[in-house]
Design a protein with these regions (language model features):
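Short loop/turn motifs that connect adjacent beta-strands in outer-membrane beta-barrel proteins
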Residues: 20-31, 66-77, 165-172, 209-215, ...
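Extracellular loop and loop/strand-boundary signature of outer-membrane beta-barrel proteins
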Residues: 45-51, 142-147, 185-191, 226-233
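Predominantly the C-terminal beta-signal and adjacent terminal strand-loop region
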Residues: 24-29, 204-249
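Short glycine/proline- and aromatic-enriched beta-strand/turn motifs that initiate or cap beta-hairpins
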Residues: 18-67, 238-248
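Gram-negative (and chloroplast) outer-membrane scaffold detector with strong preference
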Residues: 57-185
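Residues that define the transmembrane beta-barrel architecture of outer-membrane proteins
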Residues: 29-31, 53-59, 149-156, 170, ...
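Transmembrane beta-strands of outer-membrane beta-barrel pores
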Residues: 37-43, 57, 81-89, 178-186, ...
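Transmembrane beta-strands of outer-membrane beta-barrel proteins
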Residues: 29-37, 57, 75-81, 172-178, ...
Length: 249
């Protein structure tokens, strides 16, 4: 065999080995740092919470440390921090009164501060009766709705993630985390708590651009409540959409 043929054979063998190694290299790294954004447009009674109509927005970071790696399965410990998180509650700002009978009266009773409510108030007029000076007046009362936003900081140190097909660019995964959230005032209603516990679980897909860079799209069930430590504890159940960009090492 000529020298040229030997060189060509060696080059082909080297390329084949390189491709085989690339195929076998997992898209999984021992440590992963990530940044993410989250949004939930509404809350409702999904499992435990009863505070409806809440919106949640969050920006945060996470750290993953791999615990095991197999051919078709990988697991990692996860911790997340949310230095910026906003919880928007529906409120009642006042009551609009209408009494058409003579002497007619209409006016607005405004509260000194908006009152957060368990459920968004309806704008449908309610029939009411006013008795004064031996006269009875029939009219309507309409609640005036509003919102308030509270900035929250949250930390979830206890989490775990299981990924399928760690050798593939597209990896389905499931996650579960537990932690707490701290706010400057009670959420979601008065007399609840400024310190709440959180837990969440969800599923998504991780898409690798390279062996160390990836994007994640995920949907989670998120619960926030004070576990009965205060007079009020309606709790918030939210369906959260999450987008993450990750750097592996």
């Amino acid at each position: 065999m000529s020298k040229a043929g030997l060189c060509l054979l060696a080059a082909s063998t080297a390329c084949g080995v390189t491709r085989a190694q690339d195929v076998n290299v997992p898209y999984s790294t021992p440590k992963v740092f990530s940044g993410f954004v989250e949004y939930s447009n509404d809350s409702s009674h999904m499992l435990l919470g009863y505070a409806d109509g809440r919106k949640i927005t969050a920006v945060g970071a996470s750290f993953e440390k791999r615990s095991f790696l197999k051919q078709n399965l990988a697991g990692s410990w996860v911790a997340e921090v949310r230095p910026f998180m906003s919880v928007t509650d529906p409120t009642m700002k006042g009551i609009s009164l209408e009494f058409p009978q003579e002497p007619s009266y209409s006016g607005i009773v405004s509260f000194s501060s908006a009152v957060p409510v368990d459920k968004p108030v309806t704008n449908a007029p309610l029939n009411v009766i006013l008795v004064t000076q031996n006269h009875v007046y029939a009219g309507t009362a309409t609640y005036i709705a509003g919102t308030r936003s509270t900035f929250v900081s949250a930390f979830s140190p206890l989490g775990y993630k299981v990924s399928l097909l760690p050798n593939k660019r597209f990896q389905p995964f499931v996650t579960g985390l537990g932690g707490f959230a701290v706010s400057p005032r009670d959420i979601p209603v008065f007399n609840s708590s400024a310190f709440n516990f959180t837990f969440e679980f969800g599923a998504g897909v991780q898409i690798y651009r390279t062996h160390t860079r990836s994007c994640q799209l995920e949907y989670r069930y998120h619960h926030l409540a004070n576990t009965g430590g205060s007079a009020e504890n309606p709790g918030i159940d939210s369906g959260v959409f999450k987008a993450t960009y990750s750097f592996g090492r």
